[in-house]
Protein backbone atom coordinates (compact mmCIF):
# COMPACT_ATOMS: atom_id res chain seq x y z
CA UNK A 1 0.00 0.00 0.00
CA UNK A 2 1.55 3.31 -1.11
CA UNK A 3 1.72 6.07 1.46
CA UNK A 4 1.12 9.63 0.26
CA UNK A 5 2.92 12.38 2.13
CA UNK A 6 0.46 14.69 3.80
CA UNK A 7 0.42 18.40 3.16
CA UNK A 8 0.64 20.76 6.12
CA UNK A 9 -3.07 21.49 5.74
CA UNK A 10 -4.01 17.79 5.65
CA UNK A 11 -1.91 17.09 8.74
CA UNK A 12 -3.48 20.00 10.65
CA UNK A 13 -6.99 18.86 9.67
CA UNK A 14 -6.27 15.31 10.85
CA UNK A 15 -4.71 16.63 14.05
CA UNK A 16 -7.82 18.72 14.74
CA UNK A 17 -9.99 15.61 14.24
CA UNK A 18 -7.83 13.66 16.69
CA UNK A 19 -7.98 16.44 19.28
CA UNK A 20 -11.78 16.59 19.01
CA UNK A 21 -12.03 12.80 19.41
CA UNK A 22 -9.74 12.82 22.45
CA UNK A 23 -11.63 15.72 24.03
CA UNK A 24 -14.89 13.83 23.47
CA UNK A 25 -13.60 11.10 25.77
CA UNK A 26 -15.69 8.30 24.31
CA UNK A 27 -12.78 6.29 22.82
CA UNK A 28 -11.29 3.31 24.62
CA UNK A 29 -7.96 3.67 26.37
CA UNK A 30 -6.18 1.76 23.60
CA UNK A 31 -7.79 3.86 20.86
CA UNK A 32 -6.98 7.03 22.78
CA UNK A 33 -3.33 6.01 23.06
CA UNK A 34 -3.21 5.22 19.33
CA UNK A 35 -4.77 8.60 18.51
CA UNK A 36 -2.36 10.36 20.87
CA UNK A 37 0.62 8.68 19.20
CA UNK A 38 -0.69 9.63 15.74
CA UNK A 39 -1.21 13.19 16.99
CA UNK A 40 2.42 13.39 18.13
CA UNK A 41 3.56 12.16 14.70
CA UNK A 42 1.37 14.74 12.97
CA UNK A 43 2.66 17.49 15.26
CA UNK A 44 6.25 16.60 14.33
CA UNK A 45 5.33 16.57 10.65
CA UNK A 46 3.77 20.04 10.96
CA UNK A 47 6.78 21.37 12.87
CA UNK A 48 9.13 20.01 10.20
CA UNK A 49 7.08 21.59 7.42
CA UNK A 50 7.01 24.93 9.24
CA UNK A 51 10.79 24.83 9.77
CA UNK A 52 11.28 24.05 6.09
CA UNK A 53 9.06 26.98 5.10
CA UNK A 54 10.98 29.23 7.52
CA UNK A 55 14.27 28.24 5.88
CA UNK A 56 12.86 28.97 2.43
CA UNK A 57 11.67 32.38 3.60
CA UNK A 58 15.12 33.11 5.02
CA UNK A 59 16.58 32.82 1.55
CA UNK A 60 14.49 35.61 0.08
CA UNK A 61 16.81 37.87 -1.84
CA UNK A 62 16.51 41.66 -2.00
CA UNK A 63 16.84 43.57 -5.26
CA UNK A 64 20.48 44.26 -4.33
CA UNK A 65 21.10 40.52 -4.06
CA UNK A 66 21.47 40.49 -0.29
CA UNK A 67 19.97 37.71 1.76
CA UNK A 68 17.32 38.79 4.25
CA UNK A 69 17.68 36.69 7.42
CA UNK A 70 14.43 35.48 8.93
CA UNK A 71 14.09 35.98 12.66
CA UNK A 72 11.14 34.62 14.59
CA UNK A 73 9.55 36.84 17.22
CA UNK A 74 11.16 36.48 20.61
CA UNK A 75 14.44 35.09 19.32
Swiss-Prot record:
Biological process per Gene Ontology, one example term: DNA catabolic process
Acetylation found in the keyword field: no
HAMAP family for the chain: Exonuc_7_S (MF_00337)
Protein name in the entry: Exodeoxyribonuclease 7 small subunit
Gene3D superfamilies, per database record: Exonuclease VII, small subunit
Transmembrane segment boundaries: none
UniProt function note: Bidirectionally degrades single-stranded DNA into large acid-insoluble oligonucleotides, which are then degraded further into small acid-soluble oligonucleotides.
Main subcellular location: cytoplasm
Stated family: Belongs to the XseB family.
Catalytic activity, EC: 3.1.11.6
Enzyme type, top EC level: hydrolase
Domain of life of the source: Bacteria
Catalytic activity: Exonucleolytic cleavage in either 5'- to 3'- or 3'- to 5'-direction to yield nucleoside 5'-phosphates
A cellular component annotation (GO) from this entry: cytosol
GO molecular function term, any single one: exodeoxyribonuclease VII activity
Amino acid sequence: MATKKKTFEEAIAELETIVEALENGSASLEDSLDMYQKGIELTKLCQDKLQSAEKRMAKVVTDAGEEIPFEADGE
